[in-house]
A protein has these predicted regions:
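Glycosyltransferase specificity loop/lid
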Residues: 1-156, 246-301, 307-386
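Donor-nucleotide binding loops and adjacent catalytic segments primarily
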Residues: 5-7, 188-286
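Short amphipathic alpha-helical surface micro-motifs
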Residues: 39-41, 108, 160-165, 179-185, ...
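Active-site-proximal region of nucleotide-activated glycan assembly enzymes
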Residues: 126-195
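Short flexible/disordered coil segments
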Residues: 168-172, 228-237, 313, 317
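Flexible, active-site-adjacent loop/turn segments at secondary-structure boundaries
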Residues: 185, 198-201, 329, 362
Length: 386
């Protein structure tokens, strides 16, 4: 179903932006669908196809504008944050809740207007946080503001919904009934968290027994951001130049943010628009990445060491943590092809990095992320967990 709202659903997912926001939302929905709950997704043009492909019923926004996928977030931050906190999104979510009558909502944490709508409708609402929440919470506790909240616009929206204003950034972020963080607590920044903050870890990871490729031709996954980021084409080119001529094979997942025509691809690199990382990673010896949280945690869940070259946002933190865990090497964005080749050679030659990644994989498995998330979400809606 696309665009229709004639039937009820048990859980409504409010999505808007793509990139790293979307996969954990859909993974959370899949966990509920596996419990025989009917899950619907409120989707923009950026998220609709992925939601349909995941098997969910999809309804569209009626008032809210679509996100701008051609511009880096940093270049449109004020506009994007105002839209995400704006009344149009809130009214669309309110209408969807009124018509579909879900028992709970799961909302992208970057959509404060949708969270406010859930509060106004009295629907149990979970904010799905897809980055290390400790970073944001520590910043807000210092009174240094919040990364992604236009509080003035949000309070205008809350006023229109007859809600009290958010007193500060932390109050805005922690207004939902549950903050479900898709990061292991031991990976996040150590700080105090209220009980409503639940660290589950990466959701929907499908691990397999380890499979090693040829020792002479190890396979390396090259995975970068699916959204536009400054410096990304140059980084991908330097990584490809570093790998050219090396005794290895690589698969480059080149998403919609970078055109393949802009990159000189060496003969030992296969380019694909998309790959199922859970199927691919068991064959890989290592991962080269910008350090986005989704790729970082999935590599760790599969016990794969990483070479990380952060582009920005939370990626510096993720790369640093991977290094502290002994599971990766962290290089600056401007590293040369020679420096990248040298670091990758060390990563593949020194077994300590693979051992560090295996320890992280065991820790993630012990956390039981899917069960933790399912229990938290069903508990929020007071649905019996079996």
């Amino acid at each position: 179903m696309t665009g229709e709202r004639s039937a009820r659903c048990d859980a409504l997912i409010a999505s808007w932006g793509s990139g790293g926001n979307l996969p954990p939302l859909l993974a959370a929905g899949a966990l509920l669908a596996a419990r025989d709950l009917r899950v619907c997704v409120l989707a923009s043009s950026a998220t609709q196809q992925a939601a349909v492909d995941a098997g969910f019923d999809v309804v569209g926004y009626r008032r809210a504008r679509d996100p701008d996928l051609k511009t880096a977030f940093e270049d449109q931050a004020d506009r994007a944050m105002a839209t995400a906190a704006g009344l149009e999104i809130a009214l669309d979510v309110r209408d969807a809740v009124a018509e579909l009558k879900p028992q709970l909502m799961i909302v992208d944490c970057m959509l404060p207007a949708a969270l406010a709508a859930g509060e106004a409708m009295g629907t149990p609402t979970a904010s799905l946080v897809h980055f290390p929440y400790g970073l944001a919470r520590t910043q807000m506790l210092r009174g240094a503001g919040a990364w992604t909240t236009d509080r003035a616009q949000l309070n205008d929206t809350r006023h229109a919904l007859r809600l009290a204003p958010a007193a500060d950034a932390l109050a805005a972020w922690e207004s939902p009934d549950l903050l479900l963080v898709t990061v292991p607590k031991w990976f996040d920044l150590p700080t105090e968290y209220p009980a409503k903050v639940v660290h589950a870890g990466p959701l929907g990871v499908r691990t397999e027994p380890r499979r090693s490729g040829s020792a002479k031709q190890p396979l390396v996954l090259l995975s970068f951001s699916t959204t536009v980021m400054h410096g990304q084409p140059g980084l991908i080119q330097r990584v490809c130049d570093a790998i050219s001529g090396e005794g290895l094979r690589a698969i480059l997942t080149l998403g919609p943010a970078v055109s393949g025509e802009a990159i000189r691809i060496p003969g030992n690199v296969e380019v694909v628009p998309y790959a199922d990382h859970d199927q691919l990673l068991p064959r890989c010896a290592a991962v080269v990445t910008h350090g986005g949280l989704g790729t970082t945690l999935r590599a760790l869940a599969h016990g794969k060491p990483m070479l990380l070259l952060p582009l920005g946002r939370d990626q510096e933190f993720n790369a640093r943590r991977a290094g502290e865990l002994g599971a990766g090497i962290h290089l600056p964005l401007g590293a040369s092809p020679n420096e990248i080749a040298s670091a990758l050679g060390e990563l593949l030659a020194q077994p300590s990095y693979a051992e560090g990644a295996e320890r992280a994989a065991a820790a993630i498995a012990a956390d039981r992320p899917d069960q933790t998330a399912t229990e938290a979400l069903l508990g929020l809606a007071k649905i019996k967990f079996e």
